[in-house]
Regions:
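C-terminal motif of bacterial Sec signal peptides marking the signal peptidase cleavage site
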Residues: 3-6
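Ser/Thr-rich, low-complexity intrinsically disordered terminal regions
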Residues: 8-148
Length: 148
């Protein structure tokens, strides 16, 4: 089940489902400025900007942190989170002066480690992480417009 709250779409299904959000529509200028500002306010630092002919992506560094209670309850003792903000060019918005708009999305990669398999695994059934990511998505979407 999905609901629209503010300018972002959030999944309300429980379980180990990846966190993905629709953020709204941005210009190239406010996309980079707003994303950088909101991520820094939430202790996420940009590691990489990737651009191609149809999209732009901002990728954070891994936020290595103490596991949340839901992660320790599941037997994990190490956790790290990374955010991807993707902006896809809306071709219908091109203008004479090269202006255009982006459709913006956020995806979260949360990895945890238990030591059993000697590798990190994705884990999303973490209420505190979801709350934190909902807050970041809401903060971003408040600075974009919602045309969906």
């Amino acid at each position: 089940m999905t609901f629209l709250s503010g300018c972002y779409t959030s999944s309300t299904t429980s379980g180990n489902i990846p966190l993905k959000y629709y953020l709204g529509v941005a210009t190239p200028a406010n996309y980079q400025t707003v994303v950088k500002e909101v991520l820094l306010e939430n202790n996420y630092h940009i590691e990489n900007y990737e651009n191609n002919a149809t999209s732009a992506q901002i990728i954070t560094r891994w936020n290595i942190r103490a596991p949340y209670p839901a992660e320790t309850d599941a037997g994990f003792f190490d956790s790290k989170t990374r955010i991807f903000i993707t902006a896809i060019i809306d071709n219908s918005t091109f203008s004479k002066n090269n202006g255009f708009s982006y459709e913006c999305y956020m995806q979260v990669l949360n990895l945890v480690y238990s030591g059993r398999d000697r590798e990190y695994v994705e884990f999303y059934n973490v209420p505190l992480l979801k709350s934190e990511m909902d807050h970041i998505a809401q903060s971003l979407s408040e600075n974009f417009t919602n045309n969906k």
